[in-house]
Amino acid sequence: TTLLRMINRMIEPSAGRVRINGTDTAQLPPHLLRRGIGYVIQGHGLFPHRTVAENIAVVPRLLGWKTARIADRVDELLELVQLDPATFRDRRPHELSGGQQQRVGVARALAARPDILLMDEPFGALDLLTRERAQADLQRIRLELGTTVVLITHDLAEATSLADRVAVMDRGRILQVATPETLMRRPVSDFVAALIGGTERPFRLLALCPVSKLREPGNAGGPPISATASLHAAL
């Protein structure tokens, strides 16, 4: 959480620098910096007295967008997170499921088209099934929009399934930054190796490889397996 807040300057670093696209963020006015950064917290953080549309529209209203543009953006984002605008636009947070609340939280963070999305354990409060759907939604949105996502999680499986690069931290220090596969194959310390787990490591590696990479031509019996499924799922 402290690391995320240093990225958007809610906390100023006591040493070192934070750079975005090579620019030292300390040289930018904080309010201008934050306009390019969305923030999703654990438990969604929606305003309970406002509708879904009003929650999503918070930042665009602060930026002075016209009403019609805001309405169009709200509907666009609800469709992006796969919530029907006509059904959900006027609901309040207590009328939504946990997964729906989290989707609205993501939509709100994306409202002003930020280049970076900060997510602080966004799925920690969700049940397993809802969490898996939310992770799939995030991956789809990230690929569709090209947004850079910095996500904090204590779940290694979540990190390796979602991330292009994983940074392992302990006591406020980054121990290793690597692709999920490199992290699994070459942990740099006993702490990282223990985090991965000795008996779990082969299965975590299988989860990173799609079936399509090892598929061979020919016929086979049994139920079909999706080419995009992981080898772990196939096993």
Locate the predicted segments by residue.
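Conserved ABC transporter NBD signature motif
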Residues: 16-24, 33
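Helix-to-loop junction immediately C-terminal to a conserved catalytic motif
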Residues: 8
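Conserved ABC ATPase "signature" region
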Residues: 68-87
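Conserved ABC ATPase signature
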Residues: 92-96, 100
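ABC ATPase "signature
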Residues: 177-178, 186
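Conserved catalytic motifs of ABC-family nucleotide-binding domains
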Residues: 113
